[in-house]
């Protein structure tokens, strides 16, 4: 990365394209191959093999693919004509080769486009004298903030940020950050052809679904720039309202995914200007207290104001997306609810406000009277139904929650199969440690444990009961003991099993920098 930074600093002053030539540098694809293709951190990762490929990147083949992309209809030629071997020579499976090298270009593209963003971020830290480790804040840091602030709020808007219809919109947004015209031109062409290619793989050849699932790095980066554009109004308020008291935190969870997390924005008054959309008319929305939380494509907007105020904000977002990005957005995708009567799903938790009434008897001399006190508590629960639905998509169970075996893992060793299931279980326990009631995780653990036993029994052509008796407590320890050791660092005393005796303890960890895969699947 130091070599890339030096290249960037060297050519920054020149008025000519300097990012586009990086597409033809060998180390770009070596870096992409090392981080993008082999650096999969998913707990559902299944080894994917491209037949006949020796796991070494070939710059000549990548250059050949880039050249072919510029030719008319060449990107889809291996699909339309199985006898044509344009990309990689004569081979029996051109589909896997073409998707593989297209994925390589996508990963290399992401590394190149990240250069201006990452260097800008580093320079910002140096100017503000912010240590790097302060930037890597945990996802769990959002929930103590919600617990502290949402107790006094009235309404909450559950916003699902829409996906743009046209790929060209994403490229136009990047023009504000990148001035390299050839790179942007090639990016737009690549996104357009990739969209056609991806649609073909999903509809015509389901066996090649891995191509549509693995190319995420570039599209996450481009999508994040689009989401930042959606938050233009908030940035405008911070920069142009000198009298506005504004607290903002922006953290990038991980550089390789380039996700931006807006923890919260706190304002005393909010003024929204619609001068571009309504012929110079100014609309002022004032709110004594408002908070905005976003992670990826899901945002939460809460306020102490009235329901009318929240409806104004709702129509502001709808009009902003329609007029600025030129695509229709359904207003029903923004839900406005009263916090005291609803629960909202955010970051893998079902959050709500619980009101408990406590009665206290007060004795004064000969008179006694009762005092009723209502206590409001911010509650975070484990969404068991969502998790079971995610497990069924993996698949580890049926839609109704009945555990099933994992046939694709039967070629692995017994210890590796147990370790995989145990890792999934520990990740879930770690991620949902902040739940006030963890009893729901017992069912998830049961599904994973029995699915593991069914997988092992299928591998050895035995029954589940026989295999469970053979393993004894070894299988149980793999699912529970390691989680117990992690909790023992926080809880005052050791516990025999994870969550036993601590099912009401809420623990927020500071080392969670990515959303659990089951949360994304749900």
Curated annotation (Swiss-Prot):
Primary residence: plastid
CC annotations in GO: chloroplast
GO biological process: mRNA processing; RNA splicing; tRNA processing
Subcellular compartments: Plastid, Chloroplast
Listed InterPro entries: Domain_X, Maturase_MatK, Maturase_MatK_N
Domain of life where this protein originates: Eukaryota
GO molecular function, one term: RNA binding
TM helices/strands, residue ranges: none
Pfam family, one: MatK_N
Keywords: Chloroplast, mRNA processing, Plastid, RNA-binding, tRNA processing
Function: Usually encoded in the trnK tRNA gene intron. Probably assists in splicing its own and other chloroplast group II introns.
Annotated PANTHER family: MATURASE K
Protein family per UniProt: Belongs to the intron maturase 2 family. MatK subfamily.
The name this protein goes by in its record: Maturase K
Taxonomy of the source species: Eukaryota, Viridiplantae, Streptophyta, Embryophyta, Tracheophyta
Name of the encoding gene: matK
């Amino acid at each position: 990365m130091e070599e890339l930074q030096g290249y960037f600093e060297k050519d920054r002053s020149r008025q000519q394209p300097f990012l586009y030539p990086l597409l033809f540098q060998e180390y770009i694809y070596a870096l992409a191959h090392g981080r993008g293709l082999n650096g999969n951190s998913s707990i559902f990762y299944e080894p994917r093999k491209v037949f006949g490929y020796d796991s070494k990147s070939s710059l000549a083949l990548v250059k050949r693919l880039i050249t072919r992309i510029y030719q008319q209809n060449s990107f889809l030629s291996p699909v339309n004509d199985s006898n044509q071997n344009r990309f990689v020579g004569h081979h029996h499976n051109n589909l896997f080769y073409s998707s593989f090298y297209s994925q390589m270009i996508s990963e290399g593209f992401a590394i190149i486009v990240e250069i201006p963003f990452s260097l800008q971020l580093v320079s910002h830290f140096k100017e503000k004298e912010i240590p790097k480790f302060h930037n890597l804040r945990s996802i769990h840091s959002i929930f103590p903030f919600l617990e502290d602030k949402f107790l006094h709020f009235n309404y909450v808007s559950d916003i699902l940020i829409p996906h743009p219809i046209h790929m060209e919109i994403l490229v136009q947004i990047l023009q504000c950050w990148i001035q390299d015209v050839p790179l942007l031109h090639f990016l737009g062409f690549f996104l357009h052809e990739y969209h056609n290619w991806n649609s073909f793989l999903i509809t015509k050849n389901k066996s090649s679904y891995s191509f549509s699932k693995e190319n995420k790095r570039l599209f996450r980066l481009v999508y994040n720039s689009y989401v930042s554009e959606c938050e233009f109004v908030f940035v405008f308020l911070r920069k142009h309202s000198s009298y506005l008291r504004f607290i903002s935190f922006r953290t990038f969870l991980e550089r390789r995914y380039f996700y931006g997390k807006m923890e919260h924005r706190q304002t005393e008054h909010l003024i929204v200007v619609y001068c571009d959309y309504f012929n110079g008319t100014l609309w002022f929305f004032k709110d004594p207290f408002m908070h905005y939380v976003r992670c990826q494509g899901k945002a939460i907007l809460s306020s102490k104001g009235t329901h009318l105020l929240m409806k104004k904000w709702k129509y502001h977002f709808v009009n902003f997306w329609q007029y600025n990005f030129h695509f229709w957005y359904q207003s029903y995708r923004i839900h406005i609810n009263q916090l005291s009567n609803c629960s909202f799903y955010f970051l893998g938790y079902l959050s709500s406000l619980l009101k408990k009434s406590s009665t206290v008897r007060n004795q004064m001399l000969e008179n006694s009277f009762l005092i009723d006190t209502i206590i409001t508590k911010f509650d975070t629960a484990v969404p068991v139904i969502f998790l079971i639905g995610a497990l069924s998509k993996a698949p580890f169970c049926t839609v109704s929650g009945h555990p099933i075996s994992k046939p694709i893992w039967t070629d692995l060793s017994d210890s590796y199969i147990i370790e995989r299931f145990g890792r999934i279980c520990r990740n879930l326990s770690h991620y949902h440690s902040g739940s006030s009631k963890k009893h729901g995780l017992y069912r998830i653990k049961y599904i994973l444990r029995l699915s593991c036993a069914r997988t092992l029994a299928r591998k050895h052509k035995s029954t589940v009961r026989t295999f469970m008796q053979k393993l004894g407590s070894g299988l149980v320890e793999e699912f529970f003991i390691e989680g117990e050791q992690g909790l023992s660092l926080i809880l005052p005393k050791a516990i025999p099993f994870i969550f036993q005796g601590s099912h009401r303890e809420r623990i927020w960890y500071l080392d969670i920098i990515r959303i659990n895969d089951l949360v994304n699947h749900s």
